């Protein structure tokens, strides 16, 4: 069974797949944050127009940008997301038992749901603020 037959989220457990996301990564040889080291730390490259060096942990979904050539990806990951369970996994993906993998992936799924829920809550609060402001402006016209 090849990596391409895995669900997309599970493909990210494979370091080589994470490495492949680092297209146009600005830090290559002679740097601490090479694509290989970034992938080892759980990161994928997800650049935007304004953040060309944006990287996100596929597991805890922590996003970091503003990388410097001497930044150590594992240390930066620990500093900004010390509770990420991916950092404590001592086995390669292929060495995990099914039970270990499913427990780990349950944590990843919970992280994803928490991130999405927080994002939706912020969107809701911003919309509520705009609506409240519009209502107050209408009330002031009376």
From Swiss-Prot:
Q: What Pfam families would the database entry show?
A: BIR
Instruction: State the superkingdom.
Output: Eukaryota
Query: What does UniProt say on post-translational modification here?
Result: Ubiquitinated by the Cul9-RING ubiquitin-protein ligase complex, leading to its degradation. Ubiquitination is required for centrosomal targeting. Deubiquitinated by USP35 or USP38; leading to stabilization. Acetylation at Lys-129 results in its homodimerization, while deacetylation promotes the formation of monomers which heterodimerize with XPO1/CRM1 which facilitates its nuclear export. The acetylated form represses STAT3 transactivation. The dynamic equilibrium between its acetylation and deacetylation at Lys-129 determines its interaction with XPO1/CRM1, its subsequent subcellular localization, and its ability to inhibit STAT3 transactivation.
GO cellular component terms? centriole; chromosome passenger complex; chromosome, centromeric region; cytoplasm; cytoplasmic microtubule; cytosol; interphase microtubule organizing center; kinetochore
Q: Where are the BIR repeats?
A: 18-88
Q: Where is this site: Interaction with FBXL7?
A: 126
Molecular function terms, GO-annotated: cysteine-type endopeptidase inhibitor activity; cysteine-type endopeptidase inhibitor activity involved in apoptotic process; microtubule binding; protein homodimerization activity; tubulin binding; zinc ion binding
Please list the residues that bind Zn(2+): 57, 60, 77, 84
| Assembly description | Monomer or homodimer. Exists as a homodimer in the apo state and as a monomer in the CPC-bound state. The monomer protects cells against apoptosis more efficiently than the dimer. Only the dimeric form is capable of enhancing tubulin stability in cells. When phosphorylated, interacts with LAMTOR5/HBXIP; the resulting complex binds pro-CASP9, as well as active CASP9, but much less efficiently.
Q: Which PANTHER family match?
A: BACULOVIRAL IAP REPEAT-CONTAINING PROTEIN 5, DETERIN
Q: What is known of its domains?
A: The BIR repeat is necessary and sufficient for LAMTOR5 binding.
Q: What is this protein called?
A: Baculoviral IAP repeat-containing protein 5
Q: Give the originating organism.
A: Felis catus (Cat)
């Amino acid at each position: 069974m090849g990596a391409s037959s895995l669900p997309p989220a599970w493909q990210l457990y494979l370091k080589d797949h994470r490495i492949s996301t680092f297209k146009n990564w600005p830090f290559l040889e002679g740097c601490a944050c090479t694509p290989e080291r970034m992938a080892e730390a759980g990161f994928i490259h997800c650049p935007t127009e304004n953040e060309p060096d944006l990287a996100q942990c596929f597991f805890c979904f922590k996003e970091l940008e503003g990388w410097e050539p001497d930044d150590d990806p594992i240390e930066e990951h620990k500093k900004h997301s010390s509770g990420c369970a991916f950092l404590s996994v001592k086995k390669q993906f292929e060495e995990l038992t099914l039970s270990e993998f499913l427990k780990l992936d349950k944590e990843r799924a919970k992280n994803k749901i928490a991130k999405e829920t927080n994002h939706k809550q912020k969107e809701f609060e911003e919309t509520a603020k705009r609506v409240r402001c519009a209502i107050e402006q209408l009330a002031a016209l009376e």
